[in-house]
């Protein structure tokens, strides 16, 4: 995905998530760009997972608990129903795990 298209596609949702979780949306957008290779990762394209988030933990408001495994020996990863859910769960995780850094 072209970088410009990535920004145009995801920035509105990132901005909304940034406001909700009190994270600078530019920082959040940069983080998901790095994590997904500008939207090119299989987890992002096929499963709306914007941070390589593993399938551990309890379901959240944004993740219904769906897990996928990319290969027989890989970890399980979270699969989201849509991009908004994946971005919001990434922001939630950043805020809850790294609150002072955000």
Where are these regions (language model features)?
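Catalytic cores of secreted/periplasmic lytic hydrolases that degrade extracellular macromolecules
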Residues: 1-102
């Amino acid at each position: 995905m072209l970088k410009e298209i990535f920004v145009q596609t995801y920035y509105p949702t990132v901005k909304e998530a940034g406001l909700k979780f009190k994270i600078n949306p530019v920082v959040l957008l940069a983080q998901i760009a790095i994590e997904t290779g500008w939207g090119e990762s299989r987890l992002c394209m096929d499963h709306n997972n914007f941070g390589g988030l593993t399938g551990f933990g309890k379901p959240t408001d944004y993740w219904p608990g769906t897990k996928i495994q990319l290969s027989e020996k890989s970890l399980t990863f979270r699969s989201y129903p849509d991009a908004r859910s994946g971005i919001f769960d990434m922001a939630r995780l950043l805020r809850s795990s790294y609150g002072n850094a955000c």
